[in-house]
Amino acid sequence: MSSGGLLLLLGLLTLWEGLTPVSSKDRPEFCELPADSGSCKGNFQAFYYHPVHRTCLEFIYGGCEGNANNFKTIDECKRTCAA
């Protein structure tokens, strides 16, 4: 195979890896944590991964504390936790 073909194959494999969903064995442990609004009284839209439903759901984040299962966008939640 030519070096150009190898580079193309490597590029396609890299793209495939980036688009492949996270498997449960590769999912960070914090994705299993419940939604936690924290102790502050803000009203911010956030998203968390719900392990039973295996999807990302919206919740209201108070603005401080909480836990790591807290994402600003649903896409960020899906990239990190969704299988």
From Swiss-Prot:
Annotated signal sequence range: 1-24
Compartments (UniProt record): Secreted
Gene Ontology cellular component annotations, sorted alphabetically: extracellular space
Site (Reactive bond for trypsin): K41, G42
GO MF annotation terms: serine-type endopeptidase inhibitor activity
Any Pfam family hit: Kunitz_BPTI
InterPro entries found in the cross-reference section: Kunitz_BPTI (IPR002223), Kunitz_BPTI_sf (IPR036880), Prtase_inh_Kunz-CS (IPR020901), TFPI/VKTCI-like (IPR050098)
Protein known as: Blackelin-5
Keyword entries, A-Z: Disulfide bond, Protease inhibitor, Secreted, Serine protease inhibitor, Signal
Keyword Transcription part of the UniProt annotation: no
Residue span(s) of domain BPTI/Kunitz inhibitor: 31-81
Function recorded in the entry: Serine protease inhibitor.
Bridged cysteine pairs (disulfide): C31-C81, C40-C64, C56-C77
Disulfide bond is among the record's keywords: yes
